[in-house]
């Protein structure tokens, strides 16, 4: 468990080195046993000695859930915020960028799943705005492990989508050895969006999910190796 705000906010990146979980947290297909999922979720909750945990049904959106309000058990969204103590907020990832946020007074926390679609459609500014509306000041962020630029090849359509939003996004792409393809720096793009939203205090975990198979699940690596993909990194944060 890592300290984000002294004596109030704590977080952890639950990767493959955490042995008390099979790293499956939502039933995406029938090959995953519900009892296994519940045991994994309970293991994370117990790790923090927390009262409750929020798992999201992530859909690559820019939607943020206010967990202070009554919500469904597994809401369809890609981020959440809360002022509640002992409620663990989580996001799942396996190449996309997990972002953890806290007000420096330790009273408000948030999490966001920043894939390329959510990132280009303002999930970062959405969550920062919602936290500020609840009274957050001087936000601190953690950018979790994600796919690195050297591992993330994209096509020309993807490249043009980003440039159509802002020509300056060109800086996050370099040419691939493959014609009409590029290598994209998603973590750097997410960091820019945090900076543009006023978040300057950022801890960046710069480990590449794609090239660390013993530590991190990677959807793209699984696809390239033609092996089943059903594990996730769980990034979690809590107010104590």
From Swiss-Prot:
Signal peptide segment: none
InterPro entries attached to this UniProt entry: Cu_polyphenol_OxRdtase (IPR003730), Cu_polyphenol_OxRdtase_sf (IPR038371), Cytotoxic_necrot_fac-like_cat (IPR011324)
Domain of life: Bacteria
Cofactor requirements of the protein: Cu(2+); Zn(2+)
Catalysed transformations (reactions): adenosine + phosphate = alpha-D-ribose 1-phosphate + adenine; S-methyl-5'-thioadenosine + phosphate = 5-(methylsulfanyl)-alpha-D-ribose 1-phosphate + adenine; inosine + phosphate = alpha-D-ribose 1-phosphate + hypoxanthine; adenosine + H2O + H(+) = inosine + NH4(+)
Keyword Transmembrane in record: no
GO molecular function: adenosine deaminase activity; copper ion binding; oxidoreductase activity; S-methyl-5-thioadenosine phosphorylase activity
Transferase is among the record's keywords: yes
EC number per UniProt: 2.4.2.1, 3.5.4.4, 2.4.2.28
Residue sites binding Zn(2+) per the record: 60, 96, 113
Keywords, ordered alphabetically: Copper, Hydrolase, Metal-binding, Oxidoreductase, Transferase, Zinc
SUPFAM superfamilies found in the cross-reference section: CNF1/YfiH-like putative cysteine hydrolases
Pfam families: Cu-oxidase_4
Role: Purine nucleoside enzyme that catalyzes the phosphorolysis of adenosine and inosine nucleosides, yielding D-ribose 1-phosphate and the respective free bases, adenine and hypoxanthine. Also catalyzes the phosphorolysis of S-methyl-5'-thioadenosine into adenine and S-methyl-5-thio-alpha-D-ribose 1-phosphate. Also has adenosine deaminase activity.
Similarity annotation: Belongs to the purine nucleoside phosphorylase YfiH/LACC1 family.
NCBIfam families xrefs: peptidoglycan editing factor PgeF (TIGR00726)
Subunit structure and binding partners: Homodimer.
Protein name (database record): Purine nucleoside phosphorylase RP494
Origin species: Rickettsia prowazekii (strain Madrid E)
């Amino acid at each position: 468990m890592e300290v984000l705000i002294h004596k109030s906010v704590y977080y952890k990146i639950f990767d493959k080195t955490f042995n008390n979980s099979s790293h499956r947290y939502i039933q995406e297909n029938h090959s995953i046993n519900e009892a296994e999922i519940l045991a994994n979720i309970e293991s994370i909750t117990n790790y923090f000695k927390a009262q409750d945990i929020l798992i999201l049904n992530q859909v690559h959106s820019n939607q943020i859930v206010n967990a202070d309000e009554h919500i469904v058990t597994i809401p369809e969204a890609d981020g959440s915020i809360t002022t509640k103590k002992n409620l663990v907020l989580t996001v799942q990832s396996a190449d996309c960028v997990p972002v953890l946020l806290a007000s420096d007074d330790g009273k408000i926390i948030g999490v966001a799943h920043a894939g390329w679609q959510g990132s280009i459609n303002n999930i970062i500014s959405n969550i920062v705005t919602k936290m500020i509306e609840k009274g957050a000041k001087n936000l601190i962020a953690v950018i979790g492990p994600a796919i690195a630029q050297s591992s993330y090849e994209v096509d020309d359509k993807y490249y043009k989508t980003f440039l159509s939003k802002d020509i300056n996004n060109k800086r996050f792409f370099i040419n691939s050895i493959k014609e009409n393809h590029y290598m994209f720096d998603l973590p750097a793009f997410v960091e820019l969006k945090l900076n543009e939203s006023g978040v300057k205090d950022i801890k960046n975990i710069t480990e590449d999910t794609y090239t660390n198979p013993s530590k991190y699940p990677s959807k793209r690596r699984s696809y390239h190796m033609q092996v089943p993909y059903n594990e996730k990194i769980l990034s979690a944060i809590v107010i104590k």
